[in-house]
Amino acid sequence: MSFKREGDDWSQLNVLKKRRVGDLLASYIPEDEALMLRDGRFACAICPHRPVLDTLAMLTAHRAGKKHLSSLQLFYGKKQPGKERKQNPKHQNELRREETKAEAPLLTQTRLITQSALHRAPHYNSCCRRKYRPEAPGPSVSLSPMPPSEVKLQSGKISREPEPAAGPQAEESATVSAPAPMSPTRRRALDHYLTLRSSGWIPDGRGRWVKDENVEFDSDEEEPPDLPLD
């Protein structure tokens, strides 16, 4: 950046130099470490007591002090872990995985030691095969051959035995598969029953027919028609 001078006024040159120095100093100060007030002065945002300074040169001198440096360390010590967590979540996950991998052998070893100490008895394994144990010899049964005459008698008895009768289910299935033909009288009785029911007559349970109260009859007959003989 170049400055253009007008005339030979040394005071103007000093003002320009001071402004240039102030711009250079301000470029090295982060925005979150200093605040510019309305009256043109500067306040330090790092120190807890918020000192107010008149010029950038005074702010630069304050920033070089021990109190400001200690406050700066505390400020970034609290702020940096949060930034790292927000910016690098993947890195944090990788570090956790590495820690778990490093601790895994120790955990497995301690787990095995505790299990072996608690379980004194051998573990049951379902894949193990049962060892062969010779069975105790039972009472010997003499299988003497039968004479040929007895063999013939036994075979004759077996051939003469009748076959077992079929159960009730088989009889029912036979009757269902082959229904008996209906007689004419039975058919007439069934037709008469259906006509009475369709006309509005209902049986009272005593062998008589009674008019249904919910049905309207055309005639005033109190007795149902008789069963036709033909």
Swiss-Prot record:
One of its GO terms (molecular function) is enzyme binding. Residues 81-102, 205-214 have a biased composition (Basic and acidic residues). A zinc finger (Matrin-type) spans 42-74. Signal peptide: none annotated. GO terms for biological process: alternative mRNA splicing, via spliceosome; RNA splicing. It is found in: Nucleus, Nucleoplasm; Nucleus speckle. A motif (Bipartite nuclear localization signal) lies at residues 4-20. Residues 215-230 have a biased composition (Acidic residues). Residues 164-174 have a biased composition (Low complexity). There is a cross-link at residue 67 (Glycyl lysine isopeptide (Lys-Gly) (interchain with G-Cter in SUMO2)). The modification Phosphoserine is found at residues 2, 144, 183, 219. One of its GO terms (cellular component) is nuclear speck. This is Sodium channel modifier 1.
